[in-house]
Curated annotation (Swiss-Prot):
InterPro entries: CFI, Chalcone_isomerase, Chalcone_isomerase_3-sand, Chalcone_isomerase_bundle_sf, Chalcone_isomerase_sf. Changing residue 202 to V: In strain: cv. Cha-0. This is Chalcone--flavanone isomerase 1. Keywords: Flavonoid biosynthesis, Isomerase. The keyword Isomerase applies. Pathway: Secondary metabolite biosynthesis; flavonoid biosynthesis. The keyword Calcium does not apply. Its EC number is 5.5.1.6. SUPFAM superfamilies: Chalcone isomerase. Induction: By light. Substrate binds at residues 59, 124, 201.
Length: 246
């Protein structure tokens, strides 16, 4: 192992602010109900539809990421503007498939039944898989389990649906009747494609929340630039130290 690798320190946890979206507050960091890892707020936005000329908001969505997402994404995407990232399909695919934990908090603005919510989510997931040519029996069974988890649930305004996506591909589902986040989930589905598709259906190319997509792009653009600047300062300090030692 080289001396530079031996001296490398873990990336600092990103310092971010909370976000207020349509009277819903997303705190700067949360503990994942799947792993208890701290995750930072990557972005937030609304999901709504234009109904008879009026934009109706159904849910407000926050996306949280593990701290190592920033250096991982920085390798390819640092220096890109918010606009460039927002328009980049590969960038959001890398977030969706990246080897770091993700967490999604979906807070209700209007009441929804579990059946209404889960059927729409799985419909979007299946559309993504078919587009990618990835729909198999395993995914069909994962969809059945997903629908079963939600079948008897109802979600009044202010309640939340929570998803934790592990780097290994499991999807942990949890529910909250208020703003709290439970320490553990109520069910785990071991299907990597389903876990990824749930997130992609929100922030991907045809995702249901363009506002969340824009928010994630804006925040990560800033964080990657900050990470780049800090790394350059750190590298310069190491070079100075080595020069003095020699």
């Amino acid at each position: 192992m080289s001396s530079s690798n031996a001296c490398a320190s873990p990336s600092p946890f990103p310092a971010v602010t909370k976000l207020h979206v349509d009277s819903v507050t997303f705190v700067p960091s949360v503990k994942s109900p799947a792993s208890s890892n701290p995750l930072f707020l990557g972005g937030a936005g609304v999901r709504g539809l234009d109904i008879q000329g009026k934009f109706v908001i159904f849910t407000v969505i926050g996306v949280y990421l593990e701290g190592n997402a920033v250096p991982s994404l920085s390798v390819k995407w640092k220096g890109k503007t918010t606009e460039e990232l927002t328009e980049s399909i590969p960038f959001f695919r890398e977030i969706v498939t990246g080897a770091f934990e993700k967490f999604i908090k979906v807070t209700m603005k209007l009441p929804l039944t579990g059946q209404q919510y889960s059927e729409k989510v799985t419909e979007n997931c299946v559309a993504i898989w078919k587009q990618l040519g990835l729909y198999t029996d395993c995914e069909a069974k994962a969809v059945e389990k997903f629908l079963e988890i939600f079948k008897e649930e109802t979600f009044p305004p202010g309640s939340s649906i929570l998803f934790a996506l592990s780097p290994t591909g499991s999807l942990t589902v949890a529910f909250s009747k208020d703003d709290s986040i439970p320490e553990t989930g109520i069910a785990v589905i071991e299907n990597k494609l389903l876990a990824e598709a749930v997130l992609e259906s929100i922030i991907g190319k045809n995702g249901v929340s363009p506002g969340t997509r824009l928010s994630v792009a804006e925040r990560l653009s800033q964080l990657m630039m900050k990470n780049k600047d800090e790394k350059e300062v750190s590298d310069h300090s190491v070079e100075e130290k080595l020069a003095k030692e020699n």
